[in-house]
Amino acid sequence: MDQFLITGSSRIAGEVTISGAKNAALPLLAAMILAETPTTLHNVPSLQDVRTLIELIGGMGIKIQKQGDTVTCDTKSIDNFYAPYDLVKTMRASILVLGPLLARFGEAEVSLPGGCAIGSRPVDQHLKAFEAMGASITVENGYVIAQAPKGGKLLGCKFSFDMVTVGGTENVIMAAALAKGTTVLGNCALEPEVVDLANMLVAMGAKISGIGTAIMTIEGVERLHGCEYAVVPDRIETGSYLAGALMTGGDVLTKNTSALLLTPVLEKFEDMGAIITSGDDWIRAQMKGRPKAVDIRTQPHPGFPTDMQAQVMAIACLADGTSTFIENIFENRYMHVPELNRLGASIQVDGHTAVVKGVECFTAAPVMATDLRASMSLVMAAAAAEGESLIDRIYHIDRGYEHVEKKLRALGVNIERINSND
């Protein structure tokens, strides 16, 4: 199992090009199932989760061509509607093939998903919506078995999600695009990745209004065609590298990104003392001195994203003062706290609240990555620490950060990937 060896006391500075967003690429790849003609997707990040989903849809008989960051899918040869546990177990987003399969082919059998263990994150909202559209849903031996109503077409309906769910919103708008009649969805997620998916569906011939709002109306069409589309930049990768500048008194320029995707995070960075400048496709963070303490409350978009909570907490560990974090999205997303404390942080957790008392510096220690975003917070903390830190279970970071060592080295981080079996 690979590990990172990081020699700290780095000043994180330089330029880094941001990849396409993993959380956008996955639903866009799933949406390709809906198209009767080939679809080409650009700016696709080379990540384990992406490779897994490509393998998953390829196993259905879909012809896939990949060249660089471009993926083309032709669904003419699809011959099964099955998503096996062996692939689904590692990645939660695999449930997103359920809606497209059910909508286009009238049936699907998809294993219940895996992914980061940061909360229950149930798929019941997906299933309730499909049932409201007339589908028959059963769960047997860990598999969701779905069947469209008589005639093979889902039926448009009015449905409001009980809670804001990004995956649920994505799954249902894909299904509704080919449903018979009109679907009105309430309490939709507003995340940029949801907007990106809706825009691609429109490019494929879908009729969707209310994109980017809590109420979307989807008028079902008979068929969807392929298109050429580019994945939106990864706002979380952007924020993660900018966070490194704040932790180390650095200066980081992120390219191929957009400040419009990251407004609540950039505002907090400015509150912490950073100088933030931006243009159409770049953001720069400059930092001098210790960060200032802040209070963070995670919320669905357009609030502060839970996927940046761990990285900003790592900055707060070095802040002048006490910061308070309230995690409102997932009930188990403080697993990085014991690891940051091993590096010399002073954090106490009580339920959904974490109180962070700033310290002068981190000190090197062996730590263990617990989930995707926590792993990046530990990498940045280790880069700021004095001495050598060994980070275990870095397969988490490979799921969400493309070419991470190359990009970190370009920013001045002394990082080496080692195999613990060597």
From Swiss-Prot:
Q: What is its EC number?
A: 2.5.1.7
The cross-references to InterPro entries, in alphabetical order and at most eight, read: Enolpyruvate_Tfrase_dom, Enolpyruvate_Tfrase_sf, MurA_subfamily, RNA3'P_cycl/enolpyr_Trfase_a/b, UDP_GlcNAc_COvinyl_MurA
**Pathway(s):** Cell wall biogenesis; peptidoglycan biosynthesis
Which superkingdom? Answer: Bacteria
* Compartment(s): Cytoplasm
GO terms, molecular function: UDP-N-acetylglucosamine 1-carboxyvinyltransferase activity
Q: Which GO terms describe its biological process?
A: cell division; cell wall organization; peptidoglycan biosynthetic process; regulation of cell shape; UDP-N-acetylgalactosamine biosynthetic process
- Spell out which residues are annotated as carrying 2-(S-cysteinyl)pyruvic acid O-phosphothioketal: C116
Q: Name one Pfam family in it.
A: EPSP_synthase
Which reaction(s) are listed as its catalytic activity? phosphoenolpyruvate + UDP-N-acetyl-alpha-D-glucosamine = UDP-N-acetyl-3-O-(1-carboxyvinyl)-alpha-D-glucosamine + phosphate
Q: Which SUPFAM superfamilies match?
A: EPT/RTPC-like
Sites where the protein binds phosphoenolpyruvate: K22, N23
**Binding site residues for UDP-N-acetyl-alpha-D-glucosamine:** R92, R121, P122, V123, D124, Q125, D307, I329
Output the Gene Ontology cellular-component terms: cytoplasm
Annotated active site = C116
| Keywords of the record | Cell cycle, Cell division, Cell shape, Cell wall biogenesis/degradation, Cytoplasm, Peptidoglycan synthesis, Pyruvate, Transferase
Q: Which HAMAP family match?
A: MurA
Protein's job: Cell wall formation. Adds enolpyruvyl to UDP-N-acetylglucosamine.
> Which family does this protein fall into?
Belongs to the EPSP synthase family. MurA subfamily.
Q: What is this protein called?
A: UDP-N-acetylglucosamine 1-carboxyvinyltransferase
